[in-house]
Amino acid sequence: MKASVVIANFNNERYITQCINSLKSQTYKDLEIIFFDDNSSDNSLNVIKKFSDVKIIENKKQTNFGSLNQLNAYRESINQSTGDLIFFLDSDDYFHEKKIETIVNYFKNN
């Protein structure tokens, strides 16, 4: 069972590395990481490009619709995901190392 983790980002450069590393440290390894950047003006894209196995989606539109932008980011990322399960992670947050494994096992066993 493949897991997709969708990350919506806007100007969270200082948290991205911790966020991605929390996914790289997962005990469950069959996952894809999709990073949607909403036209950040900081160094977010340069930071995320250091992770070669992360799928990057760039929104280059000059819109400022607040939470609607985040919904659009999730919609676009879900459309491009290939996982059986989809997880959402904000770019200024991180997952416990067993989060994905625990949830995948729950779905497999129920």
How would you name each of these model-derived features?
Residues 86:
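Short aromatic/hydrophobic "clamp" motif used to bind/position activated sugar donors
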Residues 37-46, 61, 90:
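A conserved acidic beta->alpha catalytic loop
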Residues 94, 98-110:
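Conserved donor NDP-sugar-binding/catalytic core segment of glycosyltransferases
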Residues 60-81:
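Glycine-rich, basic loop-to-helix element that forms the pyrophosphate-binding segment
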